Amino acid sequence: MKLLIKNGHVLDVKTGLDRVTDILAVDGIIHEVGSKIDEAGCEVIDATGLYVTPGLVDAHCHLRDPGYEYKEDIESGTRSAAKGGFTSVACMPNTNPVLDNEAMVKYVINKAKTDGFLNVFPIGALSKGLKGEELSEIGELKFAGAVALSDDGRPVGNSSLMKKAMQYASMFDITIISHCEDLDLVDEGLMNEGYQSSILGLKGNPAPAEEVMIARDLILAEYTKATIHIAHVSTELGVDLIRNAKRRGVKVTAETCPHYFTLTDNACEGFNTNAKVNPPLRTQKDVDAIIQGLKDGTIDIISTDHAPHHIDEKNVEFKIAANGMVGFETAFPLAVTYLVKPGHLSLKELVYKMSFNPSQMLGLNKGTIEVGKLADLIIFDLNEEYKVNITEFESKSKNSPFNGLLLYGQPQYTIVGGTPVVRKKVLL
């Protein structure tokens, strides 16, 4: 199969390519990048006036498969991801059964091959059963195909266990993704502790509950010389802690999510359960710090933390509603609208944070447009506005606080291995 993308503004952060040109993919591989490529025998996409970049890579999502398929499964989750411009996703292990052994890791890999619309990479559980008591067989998980380790959804509260995990992970050259949360400080808090929680009469989850654990993990990473990735950073001090650790030479990368640079805890007004996430939405001061961290490189990656929940888990009182929101289909447009359009990031910097950097952190061979590499690409109009409509989401779940929002940059084409899976915004 030959696919020719003509006259698109091709942007690639690794090669420095930033011009209008053509891309020819043959049998899924990028064969040529240049002008006036022969169209004979090709399926042609006219990308005039559009940007062509490497496909997005999500380093943090929840596909809920196995065990929670009523919320999402590998088919519906990857359909949703493809619609949002993702060509590769790494899924967290908090499934049922947990992804804490070779069989479960291979289950995800094999099911993704038959049911998935894009590349799926499982993240293995750091501890057995996500209980934080005993390390999983890290070597077994790595050799089975896990691309990282995490107990995401719960913190590793035992500092000794985390220290050992870092030492073993270093031996197997695999990164730990840390969900930083001190449950004693959370103390059953439901949203950010502050003015809004007081107004709503809801128990608060203080910023130090996140920051204390970020500090602990940075200290342990510095001591063990391990590589650590801090998930879903949401606070000003959290950004400062990571910035200072990087200056000291700690091998740390960090991510945030679109809701942490677009929303504050004001979104919880009216007891809006679609704005209930973990870590919670913070204050405008924290949002500003997250944006600054993205600008100065402290925060390397934008992930979705796509967390689908059935309507029955959200359409309840705030106290018992599930944490999380869906993110695949709004992440890139939110980043374009709130980061690129205001001038906080260039489009090239955004591609770094949503494609190249997550690929590097996970050790994937993705995030670039080079001859000989798989043709994982997206095509989009930076200036076309659209309105978010949750009824059009491909995800089984619709728990998003962004319904009705006007955004820019919705992907028009998503191409995985040289094959279009989304064409003119329609999933094929």
Swiss-Prot record:
Catalytic site: 305
CC cofactor note: Binds 2 Zn(2+) ions per subunit.
GO cellular component assignments: cytoplasm
GO biological process: 'de novo' UMP biosynthetic process; purine nucleobase catabolic process
Residues bound to Zn(2+) 2: 152, 179, 232
Sites where the protein binds substrate: 62-64, 94, 278, 309
Zinc as UniProt keyword: yes
Naturally occurring in which organism (per UniProt): Ruminiclostridium cellulolyticum (strain ATCC 35319 / DSM 5812 / JCM 6584 / H10) (Clostridium cellulolyticum)
Domain of life of the organism encoding this protein: Bacteria
Pathway named in the protein's UniProt entry: Pyrimidine metabolism; UMP biosynthesis via de novo pathway; (S)-dihydroorotate from bicarbonate: step 3/3
Enzyme Commission designation: 3.5.2.3
InterPro entries according to UniProt: Amidohydro-rel, DHOase, DHOase/Allantoinase_Hydrolase, Dihydroorotase_CS, Metal-dep_hydrolase_composite, Metal_Hydrolase
Protein name: Dihydroorotase
Cofactor(s) demanded: Zn(2+)
Regions crossing the membrane: none
Catalytic activity: (S)-dihydroorotate + H2O = N-carbamoyl-L-aspartate + H(+)
Binding site for Zn(2+) 1: 60, 62, 152, 305
